[in-house]
Amino acid sequence: MAGGIIQLAVYGTQDIFLTGSPQITFFKTIYRRHTNFAVESIVQHFIGDINFGQEIVSVVEKMGDLMSRVYLEIDIPKINLVKNSSNWIKDKSTAKNDYDKISNFYGLVYNYISVNTDLARKIKFLLSNNNISLNDISLIVLHNQFNSELDKAYTDLYKYINDTNSTDGFIQSQIPRTFNIINIFKSVYEKNLYIETNNPDEIGSIKKAELLKIINTRLYKQMYDYYIDIYRQYLSKKNIFESFENGTYEENYKFAWVEELGHAIIDYVDIKIGNQVIDKHTGDWFIIFNKLFTKIYQIENYNKMIGNVKELTIFDDKIKKSYKLIIPFQFWFCRNTGLALPLIALRYHEVMFTIKLKELSKVCYVEDNDDIVSMENLQSLYNINLIDAKLYIDYIFLDTIERKRFAQSAHEYLIEVVQYQTFDNIDHSKYNSHLKFSHPTKYIVWFVQPSHYRENPTGKTKCQWNNFGTSPDLTGQPLNNTHLRINSYERTDPNLGVGYYNYVQPYWYFISTPTDGLYVYSFSLKPTEHQPSSTLNLSRIHDFGIYLEFSKELSKIIESNCSSIFFGTYIMSYNILRFMSGMAGLGFQNI
């Protein structure tokens, strides 16, 4: 009897709870027929001056029946901060001298690496031959005639490095110490092995295997690592000299855009219906949402969309090419097609997006140079202005019957809206916040940052909008302790520790775990879903707050930079959006 038939036959009382009176089958796919529709992304243009620090407005054209996903596209300019030739560090004679030195050095390095590689290949061949003992191989390898060429190549290289007339800082640091194949062979050959056998053949075999392993796994990599840095330096000096020769040489100021530029460039964006603000998101919220909701396999692609790429964020004097930022909005109707905004039901009300962009100094930084007076001066001198910006809206087109139903019926949507509060100039070791929020709330997110992470008055320091930690690599906890408080009662246990809010809560309730310093607490069982699964009604709470105890690491940063602490907190809450008689409005107002 087949095993599967046996499994089918052994049916007991317990199985009744699983398969008694079955309601589904896994072997017959069913589906539901849907209404006829189409989706098209259509561009919308802005009213106002599209530039850093400006507010721009887009009134949504009612080209479709519903509005779903919305994307902001911003074209940032090419950055080429060429110094005045009178301020150049190099001239043609200096460039030629540098090129001559590195060229001679590179030739000696190339020769040394070539000879060393050739000898390593020969030694590897000898070691792989089982008919030659290690002692016989040593007689060949350690003979002067075998290694004289390598000795000469190393001597020439070492002499050049130590020659005071031909060295510079880079060359002087490039003495090769670890990958001379003769020295490696000699050290292994003469090494005492603390093993039980005294058989010279066995000892020789062990040492042969060790030498082959060193050659195959370590030697070639060490030679490559040594060579490649020198080769790059050689190419760099060569290109500089040749640019002097053909008249194309120029020196640039160092420059970089901040990380997560697509988020950082937004001060805020709000959506109004009939001149009533329905929801408002800040650049901080875009960063927070990304860290909690972006799937790990989407991060690389998403970073390209928002300009979080090395060619923009590395601080150097290379030209930064123009780049197209694509920033998806995260309003309720963007994340759920079942909540698509029914434009066809808004006969008398307009839908409008207002976007405030940050100033240039808050999204980039330049080298600390006395020739640079200010970021405003730099922006004017080099014409650093946005090229263009536009919205792309996914319009949904309905078939006749459904279109008529949307147009003539009243609608009531349960929507998710963001509320936030910020506090600045905090200079205590502990802080008890008092927050004013409204409506049934799914979850709360909070963070603290040194205020100077968010400021760049001179244009020469980097704003770290996405850094909620205490180190430049986004690590380190800025809080020692934190907990929630409701009407003077502790809503969460003070002894849970910051890791509970930074790691445990995101692990259980969200899609991604954020970087250090971003804390979250969910009042809902499934906060990532639109379906309510428990909330805290903050409209009924008289005193809601968060207790903060700052870490020593954060205090040191504040003290050393003469700064203060910025505290931000965001909640996701529910509200009702009603459509009736060609107009729309919120069911409940914020307190």
Curated annotation (Swiss-Prot):
Disulfide bonds: none annotated. This is Probable capsid protein 2. Belongs to the NCLDV major capsid protein family. GO terms for molecular function: structural molecule activity. SUPFAM superfamilies: Group II dsDNA viruses VP (SSF49749). The keyword Oxidoreductase does not apply. It comes from Acanthamoeba polyphaga mimivirus. Keywords: Capsid protein, Virion. Pfam families: Capsid_N, Capsid_NCLDV. It is found in: Virion. It comes from the Viruses. The lineage of its organism: Viruses, Varidnaviria, Bamfordvirae, Nucleocytoviricota, Megaviricetes. GO terms for cellular component: viral capsid. InterPro entries: Capsid_N (IPR031654), MCP_C (IPR007542), MCP_C_sf (IPR038519), VP_dsDNA_II (IPR016112). Coiled coil: none annotated.
